[in-house]
Design a protein with these regions (language model features):
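Acidic/His-rich active-site region of diverse nucleotide-sugar glycosyltransferases
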Residues: 60, 94-97, 103-187, 201
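Short, acidic, metal-binding catalytic loop of nucleotide-sugar glycosyltransferases
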Residues: 22-31
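Donor nucleotide-sugar recognition loop
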Residues: 169-176, 181, 185-216, 220-222
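Active-site-adjacent helix/loop segment of glycosyltransferases
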Residues: 205-283
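Short beta-strand-to-loop acidic/aromatic patch adjacent to the donor-nucleotide binding site
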Residues: 83-95
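A conserved acidic beta->alpha catalytic loop
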Residues: 14, 23, 37-46, 63
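Glycine-rich, basic loop-to-helix element that forms the pyrophosphate-binding segment
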Residues: 61-81
Length: 283
């Protein structure tokens, strides 16, 4: 019988993580839970350690090297110690019912074609499913921060794309998804070259190049209480800088952009950052 493990990454937000653990620790749909404390600066690790049991492992990362590195600690632990078949990557600010995980597991069990599976994500007043891998123009939109005002649907699939039970997409949200353990091991786990952001696009890019398929299961959903940990620990302009640094890494390494294309993106970033900084001064 296939086994499911879940990785929850905590950083300075033990209260949110504890709420999730209190909810999911009794779920029969999950065989093993690993909480990775990403070297929090509060007493998260000590407080979460109280939850350790036969089902729950609490691990402390030696250094906070970001989202991908922290999740890799948990994924490798699940695969090495418990030999799980499926790994769920989850933010601590996710609300998920046991039946959602059971339904996702059943789909993975009966369809070898599915390498990554995501539920529908309810995020504030929005619904997130999946998106297309970013184009060069799409990266310009991200850098200039004009998506919300002028390009809301750019890079998104039309609503009709999600009429069936399963919808194939390039990328799914990193806040909650299930991946085959042998697949994430084969691709070398998450790329630790980014600290935060773009890990989903990187994984989607790697999987697509290998011919592996990613799907959204439209019959189930979870709720995401958006970026609790990130909003608590990183200021807005710093988040923007981290985002663009990850974007540049992705474009350079995975899309093999030439030096002129990269220079243009960097110029856009400098101009956009100056504009955002000045705007922030007058708030």
């Amino acid at each position: 019988m296939s086994k499911v493990g879940i990785v929850i990454l905590n950083y300075n937000d033990y209260k949110t993580t504890r709420i999730m653990l209190d909810t999911i620790k009794s779920y029969r749909s999950i065989d093993h839970i690993v909480v990775v404390d990403n070297n929090s600066k509060d007493n998260s690790y000590e407080l979460l350690k109280e939850y350790e049991s036969k089902k729950i492992d609490i691990i402390k990362a030696k250094h906070n090297n970001g989202y991908s590195a922290g999740n890799n600690v948990g994924v490798k632990h699940l695969i090495k110690k418990y030999n799980v078949d499926y790994v769920i990557i989850s933010n601590p600010d996710i609300i998920v019912e046991s039946e959602v995980i059971t339904t996702m597991k059943k789909q993975m069990d009966k369809n070898d074609d599915i390498k990554v599976l995501s539920p529908v994500i309810h995020e504030l007043s929005k619904i997130k499913r999946g998106w297309m891998l970013p184009t060069y123009y799409g990266e310009m939109i991200t850098i200039c921060n004009t998506r919300q005002r002028f390009h809301k649907n750019y890079g998104l699939y039309p609503e009709s794309h999600y009429n069936d039970l399963l919808s194939e997409v390039d990328v799914v949200s990193g806040c909650f998804f299930m991946i085959r353990a042998d697949v994430i091991k084969e691709v070398g786990y998450f790329d630790e070259g980014t600290f935060l952001y773009y890990e989903e696009n990187i994984l989607g890019n790697i999987l697509k190049k290998k011919g592996y398929k990613t799907y959204v299961l439209n019959s189930v959903s979870v709720t995401h209480n958006l970026s609790v940990s990130v909003d608590k620990s990183i200021k807005k302009l710093n988040k923007y800088k981290i985002l663009i640094k990850s974007l540049m890494y992705y474009e350079r390494k995975y899309n093999k952009r030439n030096i002129f294309a990269m220079i243009f993106l960097n110029i856009l970033f400098v101009l956009s950052y100056i504009f955002a900084y000045i705007k922030n001064l007058f708030r």
